[in-house]
Amino acid sequence: MGSEMCIRDRGYLTVMLVHVKPSLNRVIKMKDGKIYLRIGDHSNQLTVDEAIRLEYARGVRSFEEQIVEDATFDDLDPETLTLYGEKMNTEVSTIRDLLCARGAIRVKDGVERITCAGILLFGKMPTQFIPCARVRFLRYDGTHEGVGGMINIVKDEVVELPLPRLLLRMKDILASQMREFQTLDEDGTFKKHPEYPEFAWLEGLVNAVTHRDYSISGEYIRIKMFDDRIEFLSPGKLPNIVTVENIRTTRYSRNPVIARVLSDFGWVKELNEGVKRIYIDMENFFLEPPVYSEPGNNVQLVLKNNIAMRSMRRLEEIINRI
């Protein structure tokens, strides 16, 4: 639009103000092929690797669809394939057709090629081809992360399995660390109350595994459990149009192939109800709302329990008995 403004001693001049909205679903290239990214008040030229990562982030390029050059069907895990066939009521002899339909296998020049999604979902050892495809669980004694001589890790487990089996193993690990509290009800019976609603922490795990940016090498999913909270740290920023502010209502899958297959396994609902229900379940347990943030190049979810309040009430009960 045009408007007039005074330019020092030159009087009023007509200038044109042009507002260009950022492109969220494509990457703009110059005529010479160079790509620039606006950061603050500077336009930075991207390297080839940075440009590829931007294409992944914008959905222009999909990491899960890339071919894993050295992988063959023999690198896939028979146990996971059999389980998938049972879930889909498919004979083992036709499992290849199903994997092709889902995008785990691509046929190129008449040759079967395994995709990154195929390796992540069904690989015998996914980290052989994608080293970052693992989850590390850390249990700390206390509410802070000690270092050096003050290190306070009491449990440290790393899981490297095809994603459906990885989720099952991680669910067992997390469940084994959850506390139960007993309270005396009005009818004189003791009632057990879990530390966190199961759906909330399980959805945090599933989302971290399903939606992380697997193109980022050298980073892996970390789940840290303290006395007062659980932290889920997943590599990569929130994808495309999703922000910390609209995450409850906006759905966008960075890895639609992985999401679809994990939905077939029963892990993902694909109805955009997961994050909403985390908020609802935490509220129903009288716990603080979940906290989403983007520290560094990661997405973090923090679930807080009410151990401090429970300790305070316990202390009050002891004092009252004295």
Where are these regions (language model features)?
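Feature representing long, continuous alpha-helical segments
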Residues: 199, 203, 230, 256, ...
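Structured core elements
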Residues: 16-19, 119-121, 136, 222-224, ...
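Glycine-rich/acidic phosphate-handling loop/turn and adjacent ATP-lid/helix
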Residues: 230-264, 309-319
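Hydrophobic alpha-helix feature that most strongly marks membrane-spanning transmembrane helices
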Residues: 175, 179, 209-214, 237, ...
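Short, small-residue-biased leader/transition segments that mark boundaries at the very start
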Residues: 2-7
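Active-site helix-to-loop segments that bind/position phosphate- or nucleotide-bearing substrates
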Residues: 38-217, 225, 233-251, 274
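A glycine-rich phosphate-binding loop feature that marks nucleotide/adenosyl-phosphate handling sites
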Residues: 10, 140, 187-200, 222-229, ...
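Intrinsically disordered, low-complexity regulatory tails
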Residues: 8-72, 216-219, 269-272, 280, ...
